[in-house]
Structures are given as structure tokens and as C-alpha cells.
Curated annotation (Swiss-Prot):
Domain of life: Eukaryota
Catalysed conversion reaction: 3-O-[beta-D-GalNAc-(1->3)-beta-D-GlcNAc-(1->4)-alpha-D-Man]-L-Thr-[protein] + ATP = 3-O-[beta-D-GalNAc-(1->3)-beta-D-GlcNAc-(1->4)-(O-6-P-alpha-D-Man)]-Thr-[protein] + ADP + H(+)
Pfam families, per database record: PK_Tyr_Ser-Thr
Membrane topology: Single-pass type II membrane protein
Subcellular location(s) of the protein: Endoplasmic reticulum membrane
InterPro entries hit by this protein: Kinase-like_dom_sf, POMK, Prot_kinase_dom, Ser-Thr/Tyr_kinase_cat_dom
Record topological domains on the Cytoplasmic side: 1-14
Record-stated family: Belongs to the protein kinase superfamily. Ser/Thr protein kinase family. STKL subfamily.
Annotated EC: 2.7.1.183
One GO MF term: carbohydrate kinase activity
Protein name: Protein O-mannose kinase
Major place of residence: endoplasmic reticulum
Keywords: ATP-binding, Endoplasmic reticulum, Kinase, Membrane, Nucleotide-binding, Signal-anchor, Transferase, Transmembrane, Transmembrane helix
Amino acid sequence: MGGTAVGGVIGVRCGVPAVLLCLGALLCANVLLYFYLDALYQNTNPPSAHTQCPPRHFKVGTMSSCSPWLKCPEIRSGVRRVKLIGQGAVKKVYLSEWQGQKVALSVLSSDQYADDFLHGLSMLRALQSSHVVTLVGVCEEDAVFVTEYHPLGSVLTLDTTLAQERYRWRNSWHTRLQLAIDYVAFLAYLHSSPAGIRVMCDSNDLHKTLSQFLLASDMRLLANDLDALPEVEKGGLGVKCGHHELTGDFVAPEQLWPYGEDFSFSDEAMPGYDEKTDIWKIPDVTRFLLGDVLGGDVIHFHLFQIYSECKRKEAHMRPTAREVLSVYRSVYDSMMESQSQRVRDML
């Protein structure tokens, strides 16, 4: 009986350090989690090659220094085609290799689309920034240009990419909301760009709109297809996206034929419009980018008011892209602060 009592005392004395050890381990785990999340999301705008290189220079892949844009002789002799990875009406795109770096070689598909091809190239040159794919080289004589290669392809692959084991940890509201911010940031840049006020015309449906953007391996959104960006001239009559009638709910109301079924569509009679057509489409693109991720419903709740403003039928009543961007960033910061506070409360 005495031995049992002694054993019980010893068990209590030995159990106290074990409990303290467990509490200490839990505390350390929470601290590590806090610093991990803080480090992971504290910088939502990492530096890009555009900000690291002077104008008309590039740095891609494993390059340690910037190089001038490649010219015709360098492209002809140094860029080797590997395989066809994309094809549209305007151009074909080949995975290619240059000095051990993977690049994308774009080649004019047909002479009848030469104007569109050259327009896209001029926009790619003029809009080089953190919002746009990196230009590597140009040879107008051969109707080709070279850009940085992004293996994940267009942002249409987002859901399947984030379902892969290597990217599954990135399938969070942080990643997806940042992609939406990237999209709106590009529109804000496009609407006040060095090349004037530009409108995304290759955006008549959701699939077409998303196909204009690449998904980078670091889960950033980059504008890639710039073949249809007409300029809105101040005091002008606006722009028209193509010469055919547009239909559907995705396009803005002002892009629809306004004179009813009693009058046949006429390109000459169709009124022009401006960059506010891009604003109308922001909520639909955002819903795709957010998907069904945990926390997405909270984000949609916070964005409900700006969604409503973007969907105003009167184009002039819609917010600017910069105003939408400000709201999106505010929601991101608010969500991050709430998450950080929850982690701090656990400590």
C-alpha cells in the first residue's frame, strides 16, 4: 500500500514537466506559424525582371544579369524551336531554347493578320512592366518575337494547377485574391498606360478574357496577348471591339446593339464605347479566380458593394480600375490582419 502511494507521488512529479513540455511545444509551433504566415504574405508585390533591368533589356530563367533585347541575327542563329505549344488566328507559339533558357517564340500565322500581329508587338514593347510578360527579342523582318516562357500556360489552368500536389499548398484565398488584384492592377495600368487609354477587346466572353493572361509559377497573373487593345482618344467617339454584333451577358450593356431586333446590326450605326467596358467584367473574372476556396465567401461579401458598382448599366457611373484596385487591396489587407490577429490570439 505504501509502495502504491509513493508511485503515485512520483507519477505526479514526472507528469508536470511533461505537460509543460507539451505547452512549450505548442507555443513554439504557434510562433513558427505566425512568422511563416507573416513572411509568406507580407510582400504581395515582389520585384520582377522589369524593375530589375533597364529599358529594352531582359532577364529570364536562371540568368544572373540583364541582356539587351535580341535582334534578328541573334534570334535566327540562337533561338531553337522545340515544339508547338499554342496556335491562334494571329500567331503560332513555340516552346524554344536560347542559351539554355526556355523561351516562347511567337510567329505570324497568316499575312492577313499582319496588322494585328504588329499591333500586339507594339503594345508588348510599350507596356513592358510588372503586369506584362517579359519581352526577350524582336525580329519584325521575319514576323517573330520572343518572350519569357511560363510552363503553366494561361490562367485557365488555375484550378487544375492548384489541384496538383506541388501547388496544393498555394490553393488559398491569399493566392486567389492576389491573382484578382493582379488582374485589376493590369486594367488600372492599361487605362492610364504610356500608350494611352487602352481597352481589352479580346474579352467578349470569360474564356477568351482569361486566355489573354499567363499564370506564372509564383502564382502571379501576367498579361500576354495584347493583339486587340484599341486606344480611347479623349473627345473621340470611343472604340468598337470588332465589326460584328456582340451578344451575351458577359459583355457590357453598351457593347450590345442598342436599336432592338427591328433594325439589323450595322457597324456604322453602332455607337462606340470606352474603357468602362473592362470594369463591367471585373466581378465575373474575380469569381472565377476565387473559385470555391475556403474564405472566398467572406471575400465576396466584402466585395459585394464594388461588384454592384462595376455592374451599373450607365458606364460613366462605374468606378475606375484604380478605385476598384484600392478596394481589392483594402480587403486583402483586412483579411490578412484578421488572420494575423487570430494567430496572435493563439499565442
